[in-house]
């Protein structure tokens, strides 16, 4: 049986794929006058930290160079979209029951997210994450280490749990997160479907299962 679980947050425990995409789409329209293609979002935005996204944005047009204020602008727009759609600010079905059961069983748990601190604080408050995770068990993009697909965030999460990465299950939804988990030597990977035909997009031998929700997740996927 695997000893601990590390969760990505956005898109994994909380379905916000389209809200994230819309927030970035608004900025691409504003500054580049074009739409953000689905494939472009998936490869160059989804699951990446803002430092890497900023580097990508600055590669689009040599005459248009931005600083972190553009990513800050996006996060403000994203949080506003969440506030405008409170019906969307809910966990994926089965998440609360799974977290309750794992906490009661003493299973070590952490969150490893590409979010920066402003969104981490927003998520802690909105979802009352302190019910299951102390702040030191929420590892986020503090710009001191490379973001996904680098393995650092998952290596740090496993270390916080006091576990070898091979003894951990990771729950992810993005290509970059999948590659990060693989590079970290994670023992088992569960991928939540965030788009149609995801199985045909993501091919990785580490993937144990694709899921739509967390109903019946524990203990099934730790065994």
Regions found by a protein language model. Name each.
Residues 2-96, 100-105, 118:
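N-terminal helical cap/lid subdomain that shapes the substrate entry/recognition surface
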Residues 1-3, 100, 116-118, 122-223:
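Asp-based, Mg2+/Mn2+-dependent phosphohydrolase catalytic module
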Residues 12, 16, 113, 177:
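Ser/Thr-glycine-rich phosphate-binding loops at phosphate-binding pockets of nucleotides
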Residues 13, 109-112, 170-171:
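Conserved SAM-binding loop
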Residues 92, 107, 148-150:
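Hydrophobic alpha-helix-in-membranes signature
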Residues 15-16, 66, 111, 119-121, ...:
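Secondary-structure boundary/capping motif
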């Amino acid at each position: 049986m695997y000893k601990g679980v590390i969760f990505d947050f956005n898109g994994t425990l909380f379905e916000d794929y389209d809200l994230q995409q819309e927030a970035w789409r608004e900025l691409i329209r504003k500054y580049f006058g074009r739409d953000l293609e689905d494939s472009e979002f998936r490869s160059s935005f989804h699951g990446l930290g803002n430092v890497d996204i900023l580097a990508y944005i600055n590669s689009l047009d040599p005459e248009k160079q931005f600083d972190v204020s553009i990513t800050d602008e996006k996060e403000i727009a994203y949080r506003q979209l969440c506030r405008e759609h409170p019906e969307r600010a809910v966990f994926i079905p089965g998440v609360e029951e799974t977290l309750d059961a794992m906490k009661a069983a003493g299973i070590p748990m952490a969150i490893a997210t590409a979010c920066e601190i402003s969104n981490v604080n927003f998520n802690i408050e909105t979802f009352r994450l302190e019910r299951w995770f102390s702040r030191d068990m929420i590892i986020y993009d503090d710009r001191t280490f490379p973001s996904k697909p680098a393995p650092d965030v998952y290596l740090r999460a496993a270390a916080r749990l006091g576990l070898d990465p091979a003894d951990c299950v990771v729950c992810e939804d993005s290509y970059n997160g999948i590659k990060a988990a693989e590079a970290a030597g994670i023992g088992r990977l569960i991928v939540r479907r965030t788009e149609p035909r995801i199985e045909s997009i993501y091919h990785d031998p580490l993937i144990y299962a694709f899921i739509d929700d967390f109903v019946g997740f524990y203990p099934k996927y730790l065994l």
